[in-house]
A protein has these predicted regions:
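Anionic group-transfer/hydrolysis microenvironments
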Residues: 7, 35, 62
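Thioredoxin-like thiol-disulfide oxidoreductase module
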Residues: 34-52, 78, 82-85
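Structural micro-motif
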Residues: 49-58, 68
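Non-catalytic, surface beta->alpha helical segment in thiol-disulfide oxidoreductase systems
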Residues: 59-86
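Amphipathic alpha-helical interface surfaces
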Residues: 18, 40, 53-54, 63-66, ...
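Acidic-residue sensor for enzyme active/binding pockets
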Residues: 5, 31, 40, 74
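Local sequence-structure signature of Cys/Sec-based thiol-disulfide redox active-site neighborhoods
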Residues: 1-30
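Compositionally biased, disordered extreme N-termini, encompassing classical targeting presequences
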Residues: 1-3, 84-87
Length: 87
């Protein structure tokens, strides 16, 4: 299974939506809180090409974007292959 990482903040509704989609598909993911900034937030910004908003979602170290990007992948039928649910 691919490694899925999602950078989040506690009171972010977009983060909740992205996590809910992944959970509905039974996908295990590592959630990394950036509520308080610091090293984790800096790492997220560096990995995401300077983007500072959350969520920031990575699948196997590839930045796929935020919540809207994840939803578009789902709508376009591409997400399942990326997260290892199809061959």
């Amino acid at each position: 299974m691919p490694v899925v990482e999602i950078y989040t903040k506690t009171f972010c509704s977009f983060c909740w939506r992205a996590k809910a989609l992944l959970e509905s598909k039974g996908v295990a993911f590592q959630e990394i809180s950036v509520d308080f900034g610091g090293a984790e937030k800096q790492r997220m910004v560096e990995r995401a090409g300077g983007r500072t908003t959350v969520p920031r979602i990575f699948i196997d170290d590839t930045h796929v974007g935020g919540c809207d990007d994840l939803m578009k992948l789902e709508y376009d039928g591409q997400l399942d292959a990326m997260i290892g649910l199809t061959t």
